[in-house]
A protein has these predicted regions:
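Basic, Lys/Arg-enriched alpha-helical interface segments
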Residues: 1-71, 81-85, 92-117
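Short, surface-exposed beta-strand/loop micro-motifs that present aromatic residues
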Residues: 74-78
């Protein structure tokens, strides 16, 4: 009998907290209803397991996790290496361009603060 073991590792997911202690992702998430929050968290948990099938790059190191329900929710994130995801912001399809611009700004801030440590 031959068995095969696939390498398995979890992706660490963290929220980005700015210098003032704020998380744009958290600020967005807590405004949603409980059922929507549960679906967003389930999607983020799938990313922890390595499932990025609903993600699409939006430039400058930022990607969006597309959630196909409601108004087309999005979670914006950056990958810091292979095993760390930084949640930057959330939004909907309606505000997509403004949310992408905010996520780019936060990602640049994250990288700058990381270099300064």
């Amino acid at each position: 009998m031959v068995t095969f073991a696939l390498p398995f590792f979890m992706i660490e997911v963290r929220e980005y907290v700015d210098a003032k202690g704020r998380s744009l992702y958290r600020d967005w998430l807590v405004k949603l209803d409980a059922a929507t929050i549960a679906r967003v968290i389930a999607a983020v948990l799938r990313m922890e397991g390595g499932n990025f099938s609903a993600a699409k790059a939006v430039g400058a190191g930022v990607s969006e996790l597309r959630l196909d329900f409601g108004p087309g929710y999005r979670v914006y994130f950056g990958k810091d290496g292979e095993q760390l995801v930084i949640l930057l912001a959330g939004g909907s399809k309606k505000r997509q361009q403004a949310d992408i611009e905010a996520a780019h700004m936060l990602w640049n801030e994250y990288k700058r603060r990381k270099r300064e440590k």
